[in-house]
Amino acid sequence: MKLSLSPPPYADAPVVVLISGLGGSGSYWLPQLAVLVQEYQVVCYDQRGTGNNPDTLAEDYSIAQMAAELHQALVAAGIERYAVVGHALGALVGMQLALDYPASVTVLVSVNGWLRINAHTRRCFQVREQLLHSGGAQAWVEAQPLFLYPADWMAARAPRLEAEDALALAHFQGKNNLLRRLNALKRADFSHHADRIRCPVQIICASDDLLVPTACSSELHAALPDSQKMVMRYGGHACNVTDPETFNALLLNGLASLLHHREAAL
């Protein structure tokens, strides 16, 4: 699997791995890259079956497989210890990495994540699946911003959204791959295993997230032994895109604090 690695800003700089959500594209994290590469070696990638890592995914494709293939690619690139920043599905992959490779994951940041899918989130995905089946890729892509962004943010950026729609259609991961990745997300359940995650965790959520209720992050916080929760008042599901200034400040402060906390504990 292809990875994109930034040059380390200094010798032995910590590594931060960015894992996007269901869309799978590493470019999702563009608003964070400029600030992160000043302090960390940053790894971005298109998830298997998407973007520049095309593949046909098996029907039983799972979050555990997503975690294993990423870890193997990191080790092959000479990276054995790393912090993980995951958004939604990416946060699930991050938790799986922390469970399966505890010696490798130094810190986990969960952005609008959950222990197991909430009934409201499941309902949103059911609607989106119906759109996919009835209207194809175009219907899926055109509906997606409604679940990602606040209404006023979208209304002020109509040309940008049109350009994003065109790009998403041109690079659509395919119906079968999308549904298999979505099914992996829906099957994931960390409610009985989260207390085994021992690395420090920063939980970031947005109070106006239409797709994932903030209660999901509260449940995560209660279940994870060494976690802290930050709530953004605005930003929607893709709060790192809509309010990068606020998000980046939380992320940079959290990473620095938790990495120091981790090193002090060793």
Curated annotation (Swiss-Prot):
- What EC number(s) is this enzyme filed under? 3.5.1.-
> What domain of life does the native source organism fall in?
Bacteria
Say yes or no: keyword Hydrolase present.
yes
Taken from the UniProt entry, a GO cellular component term is: membrane
Question: What family is reported?
Answer: Belongs to the AB hydrolase superfamily. Hydrolase RutD family.
What functional role does this protein have? Involved in pyrimidine catabolism. May facilitate the hydrolysis of carbamate, a reaction that can also occur spontaneously.
The protein's name in its UniProt record: Putative carbamate hydrolase RutD
Supply the gene name.
rutD
